[in-house]
Structure formats: structure tokens, C-alpha cells
């Protein structure tokens, strides 16, 4: 006989989207200095974002003090929720943080291309601007999109669901979600396929899609396309003023100013050899 359901709580299996803080060094002082350098200009950027500490890049004989790394992340107002480690990294289980499993989004099968060909063709003759030169990768750590999942009951992390944002009217099909209202700070939209936004994406708002993102209004918040590893995803918007843009985990933030020919302009953004490319759209 199955136990009676409780009216007070439920326990379910599930997955939670987080950032992965990918550790690539055991030098804690260098990591602290790099974190300070990268985020001192935007201390609120990752405020209250949940993050899992990923130590799988470390060599088998290397180990780091996970409690100290958690304190470092706290110092930039991130919220560590667990550790992702290889099976042979048994020392990671000694941390007070729970062990998590994670899907490798980069290894996911790419979705079919579904970019707007008319817009792409209109921009074909425009010069491209690469974003990679503005944000060189760090030898110490990376921040990447990830999806830690609950593992066995002994190691699973319980994460409270975020408060629901104010309802937004959506029109969806099997491939595309349409948002016809402006998004205010704190609102977040996730689309399984492509996402079309007809209103302003304000500072502090976030639009996320497994496919392409089309924004027919200013983008001032965050836009993350191809979040399940689709390197062919693109971002299109009519006015680029973002806090963050990301495709398949490759991202760029406002700590690196955008060139004048794309800032506040209609653009498309795509990945080319692991670099974000930003190109003006010629709409007339």
C-alpha cells in the first residue's frame, strides 16, 4: 500500500538549471584575485544565482578546499548548492556541499538550424565583430551553463523553486514560444524551442531558449540561446544593450563594452569556432 500523500510537502526527482563554476587551478589566491578583477565592476551581476562547483577539470592528484571556494563565490553573492566531481575524486564527498550529477550540455545533440533566413540574408554583407577578443578565457576557472541533477537520495541536493514571476501571456507551438509583453526585472522565460519576444527585455530580466532567440525590442537584460548545447543557435534583436548574451554556454557580459556599430543597433549573434560573433543587421 502506497503511503498517503502529505498536504504539506512533496519529494520529487528533478533537475535545476545552475551555473557551473569550473575550477581549473588549485591556486586559491589566484582564483580570488581573478574573481575580484572580473566582477568588481558589476558586483550585483550574479547576485543570488545558484552555482555548482565543478572540479572535473582538475588532475587526479589535485584537490582544492571546497569550503574556501564556496566562500569565494559567496563574496560575489553567488549561492553554491553542490559539487560536481569525477568518480575518482572521492575527496569531493568530504565537503559539506552535496555531490551532484551534471548533464554535459556541450555534448548534447545539436538541434536543427531554424534561424530566420530572410534576416540572415539581409545581414550577409555586413562586417562581423568578434566578441572573443574582449573576454579572454581564464586559465583559473570558467562560468558555464549547466544542469546538475539529483543523484541517489543520499547525495541529492534539495533546491527550493524560485518564486513564480508575474504571469506573461504566451503563445506556443511545438517549436516556438511567443512573449507579447515587456519583461521586467526578475522575470525569466524559458523556451524549449525558439523564443520570440515582442516587448522590452528590461535590466534584470532573462530570456532563455534551447533554440534561437528573436527580440523585436531593446534587449537590456540577459539572453541565453542554445542552452542545451545547440551551437547553431542565434540571437536576433532590434536594439542590443544587454547585461549578458550567451550561446551554448559561451557568454559575454557588460564588463566588456560593445563596439559602437552594434551597441543599441539591430544585430544577430552566433558562434564561430567557440567565439561569439556580433553582426549588424541591415533592415532597410
Curated annotation (Swiss-Prot):
GO terms for biological process: cell morphogenesis; division septum assembly; regulation of cell division; regulation of cell septum assembly. The keyword Ligase does not apply. Keywords: Cell cycle, Cell division, Septation. SUPFAM superfamilies: Cell-division inhibitor MinC, C-terminal domain (SSF63848). Pfam families: MinC_C, MinC_N. InterPro entries: CAP/MinC_C, MinC, MinC_C_sf, MinC_N, Septum_form_inhib_MinC_C. The keyword Phosphoprotein does not apply. NCBIfam families: minC. Cell division inhibitor that blocks the formation of polar Z ring septums. Rapidly oscillates between the poles of the cell to destabilize FtsZ filaments that have formed before they mature into polar Z rings. Prevents FtsZ polymerization. Belongs to the MinC family. Interacts with MinD and FtsZ. This is Probable septum site-determining protein MinC. The gene is minC.
Amino acid at each position: 500500500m502506497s503511503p498517503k500523500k502529505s498536504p504539506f510537502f512533496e519529494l520529487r526527482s528533478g533537475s535545476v538549471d545552475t551555473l557551473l563554476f569550473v575550477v581549473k587551478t588549485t591556486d586559491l589566491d589566484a582564483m580570488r584575485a581573478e574573481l575580484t578583477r572580473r566582477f568588481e565592476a558589476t558586483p550585483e551581476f550574479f547576485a543570488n544565482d545558484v552555482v555548482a562547483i565543478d572540479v572535473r577539470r582538475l588532475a587526479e592528484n589535485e584537490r582544492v578546499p571546497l569550503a574556501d571556494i564556496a566562500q569565494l563565490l559567496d563574496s560575489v553573492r553567488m549561492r553554491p548548492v553542490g559539487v560536481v566531481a569525477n568518480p575518482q575524486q572521492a575527496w569531493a564527498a568530504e565537503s559539506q556541499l552535496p555531490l551532484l550529477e551534471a548533464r554535459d550540455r556541450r555534448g548534447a545533440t545539436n538541434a536543427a538550424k531554424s534561424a530566420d533566413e530572410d534576416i540572415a540574408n539581409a545581414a550577409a554583407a555586413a562586417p562581423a565583430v568578434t566578441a572573443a577578443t574582449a573576454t579572454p578565457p581564464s586559465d583559473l576557472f570558467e562560468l558555464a551553463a549547466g544542469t546538475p541533477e539529483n543523484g541517489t537520495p543520499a547525495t541529492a541536493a534539495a533546491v527550493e523553486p524560485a518564486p513564480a514571476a508575474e504571469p506573461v501571456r504566451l503563445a506556443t507551438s511545438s517549436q516556438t514560444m511567443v512573449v507579447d509583453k515587456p519583461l521586467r526585472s526578475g522575470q525569466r522565460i524559458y523556451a524549449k524551442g525558439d523564443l520570440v519576444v515582442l516587448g522590452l527585455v528590461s535590466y534584470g530580466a532573462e530570456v532563455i531558449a534551447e533554440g534561437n532567440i528573436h527580440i523585436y525590442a531593446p534587449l537590456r537584460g540577459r539572453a541565453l540561446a542554445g542552452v542545451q548545447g545547440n551551437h547553431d543557435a542565434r540571437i536576433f534583436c532590434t536594439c542590443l544593450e544587454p547585461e549578458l548574451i550567451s550561446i551554448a554556454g559561451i557568454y559575454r557580459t557588460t564588463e566588456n563594452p560593445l563596439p559602437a556599430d552594434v551597441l543599441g543597433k539591430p544585430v544577430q549573434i552566433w558562434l564561430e569556432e567557440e567565439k561569439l560573433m556580433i553582426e549588424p543587421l541591415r533592415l532597410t
